[in-house]
């Protein structure tokens, strides 16, 4: 049984797309779905085709310090390189709430990721297998601004309460519990 299902990441957006009649909103949903599929494939170049070269990512994942800010494609590539160094590309972000307007899309839901044991070890957390993956989960809100050309202008990422690293180390995942994304042939 899958614990992490990457296909759930864009499920809510695809369902909304089926009934959305506003052409601008449809384009925004399509861009985010393509973006999410690029993330699921671990294809940074594909992700960047959906993101304006002027985009800014802001991650509020450090509760005691300033947010991490990544401007432009080169820095956004660094953001994804850092992320993929710590977790499996196969992650799930099940969107429970979705707001779409002419300038922004807001997604809120539960994220699950498979953290590399080696990444936990690097944080000083004891794991029984540095080559295994461990389950992290939490709630996230992502604000997706758009430019006039329909390109994503960045992500403002607000992670809510999530798994503490020591708790993650107690949730070792079996390979068959981590779903993988593959394009339809």
Outline where the language-model segments fall.
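Exposed beta-sheet edge and beta->alpha loop/turn motif
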Residues: 109-148
């Amino acid at each position: 049984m899958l614990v992490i299902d990457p296909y759930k990441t864009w499920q809510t957006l695809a369902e909304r797309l089926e009934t959305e009649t506003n052409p601008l909103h449809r384009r925004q949903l399509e861009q985010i779905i393509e973006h999410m599929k690029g993330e699921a494939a671990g294809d940074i170049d594909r992700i960047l085709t959906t993101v304006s070269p002027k985009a800014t990512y802001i991650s509020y994942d450090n509760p005691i310090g300033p947010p991490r800010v990544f401007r432009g494609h080169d820095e956004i590539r660094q953001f994804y390189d850092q992320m993929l160094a710590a977790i499996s590309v196969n992650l799930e972000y099940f969107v429970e709430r979705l707001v779409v307007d002419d300038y922004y899309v807001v997604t809120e839901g539960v994220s699950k990721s498979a953290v590399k044991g080696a990444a936990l070890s690097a944080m000083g957390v004891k794991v029984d297998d540095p080559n295994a993956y461990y389950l992290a989960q939490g709630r996230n809100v992502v604000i997706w601004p758009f430019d006039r050309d329909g390109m994503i202008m960045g992500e403002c990422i607000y992670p809510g309460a999530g798994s503490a690293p020591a708790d993650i180390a107690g949730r070792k995942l079996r390979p068959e519990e981590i779903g993988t994304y593959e394009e339809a042939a």
